[in-house]
Regions:
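Extended beta-strand/beta-hairpin segments
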Residues: 1-52, 62-151
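Alpha-helical metal-binding/catalytic segments enriched in His/Glu/Asp
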Residues: 54-58
Length: 151
């Protein structure tokens, strides 16, 4: 018998003169835009915060899948192409046109384990709908090149 557990998460946002302050539980984040979009660059922009959430959620779920050592040794870069015209109201296309998750692992065995875990990760990752809504999404795995000291 499985029981389903739900949590209700709440964040509070307050627009200030230099960005938006968002409070989640007892944690504060500053969200702002680059000056070219009318901001002061006092924090990452909203899309960067979403990408950070996807990256963190990916590593957390990988750990929850039992791949603790892999999660602790992997690095993940999440990037996206944003349709600024859509955000500004001048275009009807997808807001996020492309999203890419680039995993870097230490060796071939880790790469094989990660590739096997990716379908399970996609089913459980919070924010997967954001990835699925992008016009194009890719998730790749590569092995880090190890360098020796002095190179």
């Amino acid at each position: 018998v499985t029981t389903s557990r739900r949590e209700h998460l709440v964040v509070h946002a307050l627009l200030g003169s230099h960005g938006t302050t968002v409070t989640a539980r007892r944690h504060e984040l500053t969200i702002d835009e680059a000056p070219r979009y009318g901001g002061h660059d006092s924090g990452a922009n909203p899309v960067e915060h979403m990408l950070a959430g996807l990256a963190a959620a990916s590593l957390v779920v990988l750990r929850l899948l039992g791949e603790v050592a892999l999660a602790e040794s992997a690095t993940l870069t999440v990037s996206a192409s944003v349709n600024v015209g859509r955000v500004m109201g001048t275009d009807d296309g997808a807001a996020i046109e492309m999203i890419r998750l680039d995993w870097h692992v230490a060796n071939a065995e880790h790469a094989e384990r990660l590739r096997a875990a990716l379908p399970h990760l996609a089913r459980r990752r919070p924010g997967q709908a954001l990835i699925d809504a992008a016009s194009i999404s890719t998730e790749g795995v590569s092995i880090r090149e190890l360098t020796t000291a002095g190179e």
